[in-house]
Amino acid sequence: MIKSMRIFLLISIVLTSFLFYKCSKKDTDEPKEMTVNFYMVALEGSTLQGKTIGCNDILVPISKNVLIEKNEVESAMNELFAAKSTDKLINFIKGPGLFLYQVTLSNGIAEIYLKGDFAISNVCDVPRIQGQLYETAKQFSDVREGKIFINAQSLESYLSLAKQGFN
């Protein structure tokens, strides 16, 4: 009798623990699938549709279903960094040792931290890089501002130094 009570008690404890664990898990604990955009560049003269940026290039949104593991901004940025150029769409988010280091999202502000360097070949690359990064970050309703840093400085400071090399 005592042995069967112990077995019953043990089974009850295990089941209760399992139920508490399952009930306490939030939906956000598991990755969810979502459609995100990342932006590629169509050069001046293209017939593709999108937002016109400096040097009369066009930012073209590319939609993709992805798993959101941390936050949607980071997932979209990962897609942008992984995207390969084609004959009609170019990805200017490339360069020696360039990688996405960290993305935080708090109170409507997305902070994106990059390390490495961009491969900038002319003055038109500056608005291309800015456009691709900021449009990819700001597409989400819970992001009202995007702040991008590269090698511990603002993207604007980094790109203004690069731009000076072409003047």
Could you describe each region identified by the protein language model?
Residues 2-11, 18-167:
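Bimodal "functional hotspot" detector
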